[in-house]
Amino acid sequence: MLAYRFRLYPSREQEKTLLEILEACRFVYNKVLEWVNGGESNLFELKRRLPKLKEENPWLRKAYSQSLQNEVFRVFKNLRVLSALKRNGRKVGRLRFKGAGWFKSFVYPQSGFKLENGKLILSKVGGIHIRLHREIVGRVKGVIVKRERSGKWFAIFQVEDEPEPLPRTGRVIGIDVGVKHFLTDSEGWQIENPRFYERTIERIRRRQKKLSKKEKGSKNREKARVKLAKAYEKLVNQRDDFLHKLSRFYINNYHLIAVERLNISGMVRNHHLGGKILDASWGKFLRMLSYKAERAGRRVVEVNPRGTSQNVPDGFDRDYVAACRILSLGLGRPELTPVEMGPPRELVSVPASTVVESGSPHPFTVG
């Protein structure tokens, strides 16, 4: 299942309706959770309670019926996630009720929507202008309507399509992620860490300080909150753009990609490096590699990181040695050494901006 995300531009009247639908879905979500906490665990019995709930609360009819029904499934999905975390030894609390302002999305799961003449037509809302910056390929199974904390609205189309494997390249590569360099690969390319958070933190702190000085409930406080949300949103967008382009490059050009199996949740507990590891978003990068590889017919092989950075031969870079050892383990040939695999032409440091601007870390196309 793929997700296509597009910006929505509702009118003031449409935004008012969208906010009313969000509130209706939040109300139903909390009511379903209340019923579950009261001992009702049958999903279909809970769905049967919705018509009576709408009779008691006529304003709920402002929302599309399937959107309200989806909140029953959302509660059960969240409960399953908590149960899975608990089985894996994680400490988890109870599912929480959603407060006003903390409910961000609702779903048209099967019907009630269509695209027509540059507009997304939603049942109970009407036609909303949408910026379709790319073609949707595949069968649309549902639409998520989401409001970001910055106040921007988006439509996320859930699309089912057939994966199309890329042509085999015969190329293999090992990747070692790090703090100084975002990654070093076994061909001798070192991608600089973009450090988006470090570059944004001062702006975020200034906006947090301004927000803290505004009177609660005032219009000025809301304006300050939106400015802060936009700063965080820009940070996330910059980071995701970099990670998507870099992961896409490796998927397009290498048939096998070997990486370390990292315990990132444990690593971030390091008080000196935790923030830098989170800023680098290694976990997100590795997840992008994995799901893109699955669709493209590529292989991402995770290896045990133990010992990959030890016993560095004279004249070799430590991160390059680690990348070569990761590759040899990924190929199932641990006896291969960096010396036998051959030194790189010359380690080349590539600015993160090169990846963002060209979509490739290399000054040439790998084919």
Task: Cite the ranges covered by each PLM segment.
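Acidic carboxylate diad motif detector
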Residues: 48-148
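Positively charged, helix-rich recognition surfaces that bind polyanionic ligands
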Residues: 3-5, 16, 124, 134-139, ...
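Stable alpha-helical structural segments in soluble proteins, enriched in small hydrophobic residues
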Residues: 32, 71-82, 318-330
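Short alpha-helical "patches" and their helix-cap loops
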Residues: 39-47, 88-98, 339-346
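Gly/serine-rich nucleotide phosphate-binding loop at the start of the catalytic core
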Residues: 1-69
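Surface-exposed helix-capping loop/turn segments at secondary-structure junctions
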Residues: 37-40, 81-91, 293-300
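A generic secondary-structure signal for well-formed alpha-helical elements
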Residues: 25, 29-36, 79, 83-86, ...
